[in-house]
Curated annotation (Swiss-Prot):
The lineage of its organism: Eukaryota, Metazoa, Spiralia, Lophotrochozoa, Mollusca. Contains 2 disulfide bonds. This is Teretoxin Tan1.1. Residues 22-38 form a propeptide. It comes from Terebra anilis (Auger snail). Keywords: Cleavage on pair of basic residues, Disulfide bond, Secreted, Signal, Toxin. The keyword Disulfide bond applies. It comes from the Eukaryota.
Length: 62
């Protein structure tokens, strides 16, 4: 049971690195633009949510 938080943090780090370094299949311009727009809108929705607006992706002013 004590290793569960460590695994959870590792999963978060892996998911962050996946978003930060997209694979070669996302290098197509239109696909990458669509992905970035979708991610940006998801981040904006999250930043408007008082529960998770403190996440690192949100601007500090909000």
């Amino acid at each position: 049971m004590s290793c569960f938080p460590v695994l959870f943090v590792m999963m978060l780090l892996v998911s962050q690195s996946v978003w930060a370094f997209p694979g070669p299949e996302t290098r197509d311009g239109s696909v990458q633009d669509a992905e970035s727009r979708r991610v940006r809108s998801a981040e904006e929705d999250c930043c408007e949510n008082p529960v998770c607006k403190h996440t690192p992706g949100c601007p500090k002013g909000s």
